[in-house]
Protein backbone atom coordinates (compact mmCIF):
# COMPACT_ATOMS: atom_id res chain seq x y z
CA UNK A 1 0.00 0.00 0.00
CA UNK A 2 1.33 3.47 -0.90
CA UNK A 3 2.67 5.46 2.04
CA UNK A 4 0.53 8.49 1.18
CA UNK A 5 -2.63 6.46 1.81
CA UNK A 6 -1.63 5.82 5.44
CA UNK A 7 -2.54 8.17 8.31
CA UNK A 8 0.15 10.54 9.55
CA UNK A 9 0.84 10.32 13.28
CA UNK A 10 1.36 13.83 14.63
CA UNK A 11 1.89 13.24 18.34
CA UNK A 12 0.07 14.31 21.45
CA UNK A 13 -2.06 17.38 22.06
CA UNK A 14 0.05 20.05 23.80
CA UNK A 15 -0.67 20.75 27.45
CA UNK A 16 -2.86 23.72 28.31
CA UNK A 17 -0.75 26.83 28.72
CA UNK A 18 1.94 25.72 26.27
CA UNK A 19 3.36 28.73 24.46
CA UNK A 20 4.37 28.92 20.80
CA UNK A 21 6.22 31.47 18.71
CA UNK A 22 3.71 31.03 15.88
CA UNK A 23 0.39 29.35 15.24
CA UNK A 24 -0.32 28.27 11.67
CA UNK A 25 -3.93 27.42 10.82
CA UNK A 26 -4.20 25.10 7.82
CA UNK A 27 -1.95 22.23 6.82
CA UNK A 28 -2.25 22.50 3.04
CA UNK A 29 0.78 23.46 0.96
CA UNK A 30 0.79 27.11 2.08
CA UNK A 31 0.31 26.46 5.78
CA UNK A 32 2.64 23.49 5.83
CA UNK A 33 5.34 25.48 4.05
CA UNK A 34 4.98 28.41 6.45
CA UNK A 35 5.16 26.08 9.46
CA UNK A 36 8.17 24.29 7.97
CA UNK A 37 10.14 27.48 7.35
CA UNK A 38 9.33 28.75 10.85
CA UNK A 39 10.47 25.47 12.40
CA UNK A 40 13.68 25.51 10.33
CA UNK A 41 14.31 29.01 11.69
CA UNK A 42 14.14 27.60 15.22
CA UNK A 43 10.63 28.79 16.05
CA UNK A 44 8.27 26.76 18.18
CA UNK A 45 5.20 26.26 15.98
CA UNK A 46 1.67 25.01 16.52
CA UNK A 47 0.30 23.73 13.18
CA UNK A 48 -3.46 23.14 13.17
CA UNK A 49 -5.23 21.21 10.38
CA UNK A 50 -9.02 20.75 10.26
CA UNK A 51 -8.82 17.45 8.38
CA UNK A 52 -6.94 14.21 8.86
CA UNK A 53 -4.25 13.10 6.47
CA UNK A 54 -4.47 11.60 3.98
CA UNK A 55 -7.12 13.58 2.18
CA UNK A 56 -7.62 14.55 -1.44
CA UNK A 57 -8.49 17.88 -2.97
CA UNK A 58 -9.44 18.95 -6.48
CA UNK A 59 -6.33 20.43 -8.06
CA UNK A 60 -4.29 20.56 -11.25
CA UNK A 61 -1.95 18.00 -9.68
CA UNK A 62 1.26 19.74 -10.74
CA UNK A 63 4.19 21.29 -8.90
CA UNK A 64 6.54 23.49 -10.84
CA UNK A 65 8.10 26.85 -11.41
CA UNK A 66 9.06 28.85 -8.35
CA UNK A 67 7.40 26.38 -5.99
CA UNK A 68 10.12 23.81 -6.73
CA UNK A 69 12.66 25.90 -4.82
CA UNK A 70 10.43 25.59 -1.74
CA UNK A 71 9.92 21.85 -2.30
CA UNK A 72 13.70 21.52 -2.32
CA UNK A 73 14.34 23.88 0.64
CA UNK A 74 11.80 22.06 2.81
CA UNK A 75 13.45 18.71 2.08
CA UNK A 76 10.60 17.19 0.08
CA UNK A 77 12.07 16.97 -3.43
CA UNK A 78 14.19 13.88 -2.78
CA UNK A 79 11.22 12.00 -1.33
CA UNK A 80 9.01 13.15 -4.20
CA UNK A 81 11.55 11.75 -6.67
CA UNK A 82 11.21 8.33 -5.00
CA UNK A 83 7.41 8.17 -5.40
CA UNK A 84 5.36 7.69 -8.59
CA UNK A 85 5.17 10.92 -10.59
CA UNK A 86 5.46 12.36 -14.09
CA UNK A 87 8.00 14.97 -15.11
CA UNK A 88 6.52 18.03 -16.78
CA UNK A 89 8.38 19.25 -19.87
CA UNK A 90 5.78 21.56 -21.35
CA UNK A 91 2.29 22.98 -21.08
CA UNK A 92 -0.62 22.30 -23.42
CA UNK A 93 -3.42 24.85 -23.72
CA UNK A 94 -6.58 23.76 -25.54
CA UNK A 95 -9.82 25.50 -26.42
CA UNK A 96 -13.35 24.11 -26.59
CA UNK A 97 -13.15 24.17 -30.41
CA UNK A 98 -10.13 21.85 -30.37
CA UNK A 99 -7.32 24.31 -31.05
CA UNK A 100 -4.13 23.59 -29.12
CA UNK A 101 -1.01 25.54 -28.26
CA UNK A 102 2.02 23.71 -26.83
CA UNK A 103 4.58 25.65 -24.81
CA UNK A 104 7.79 23.74 -24.05
CA UNK A 105 9.55 24.50 -20.79
CA UNK A 106 13.23 25.55 -20.93
CA UNK A 107 15.33 22.51 -21.89
CA UNK A 108 17.95 23.28 -19.23
CA UNK A 109 15.27 23.22 -16.52
CA UNK A 110 13.91 19.91 -17.81
CA UNK A 111 17.43 18.44 -17.93
CA UNK A 112 18.15 19.54 -14.32
CA UNK A 113 14.77 18.16 -13.16
CA UNK A 114 13.68 21.69 -12.26
CA UNK A 115 10.79 22.08 -14.72
CA UNK A 116 8.02 20.43 -12.78
CA UNK A 117 6.24 17.32 -11.60
CA UNK A 118 2.74 15.99 -11.98
CA UNK A 119 1.41 13.81 -9.18
CA UNK A 120 -1.87 13.46 -7.28
CA UNK A 121 -2.52 16.31 -4.85
CA UNK A 122 -3.18 13.74 -2.11
CA UNK A 123 0.31 12.33 -2.63
CA UNK A 124 2.08 15.72 -2.70
CA UNK A 125 0.20 17.09 0.31
CA UNK A 126 1.00 13.93 2.27
CA UNK A 127 4.73 14.18 1.46
CA UNK A 128 4.85 17.86 2.44
CA UNK A 129 2.70 17.59 5.58
CA UNK A 130 4.62 14.55 6.83
CA UNK A 131 7.98 16.27 6.35
CA UNK A 132 6.79 19.48 7.99
CA UNK A 133 5.18 17.77 10.98
CA UNK A 134 8.57 16.16 11.68
CA UNK A 135 10.31 19.56 11.41
CA UNK A 136 7.75 21.19 13.71
CA UNK A 137 7.91 18.46 16.34
CA UNK A 138 11.73 18.23 16.22
CA UNK A 139 11.84 21.94 17.09
CA UNK A 140 9.55 21.68 20.11
CA UNK A 141 6.30 22.45 18.33
CA UNK A 142 3.04 20.55 17.99
CA UNK A 143 0.77 19.47 15.16
CA UNK A 144 -2.97 18.95 15.53
CA UNK A 145 -5.25 17.25 13.03
CA UNK A 146 -9.05 17.17 13.03
CA UNK A 147 -9.10 20.50 14.83
CA UNK A 148 -11.43 23.40 14.06
CA UNK A 149 -10.71 26.96 15.12
CA UNK A 150 -13.60 29.26 16.05
CA UNK A 151 -12.80 32.93 16.41
Where do the PLM segments sit?
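Extreme N-terminal leader/targeting segments of oxidoreductases
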Residues: 1-22, 37-41
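Glycine-rich Rossmann-fold phosphate-binding loop(s) that bind the pyrophosphate
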Residues: 26-28
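N-terminal Rossmann-fold NAD(P) dinucleotide-binding loop
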Residues: 31
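Glycine-rich FAD pyrophosphate-binding loop
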Residues: 39-59
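A conserved beta-strand/loop element that lines the FAD pocket in flavoprotein oxidoreductases
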Residues: 134-147
Amino acid sequence: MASWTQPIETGDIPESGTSFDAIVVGGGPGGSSAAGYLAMAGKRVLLIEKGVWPRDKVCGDAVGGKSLSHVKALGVKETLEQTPHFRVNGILFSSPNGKEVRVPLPEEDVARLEAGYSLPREQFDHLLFDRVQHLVRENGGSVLQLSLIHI
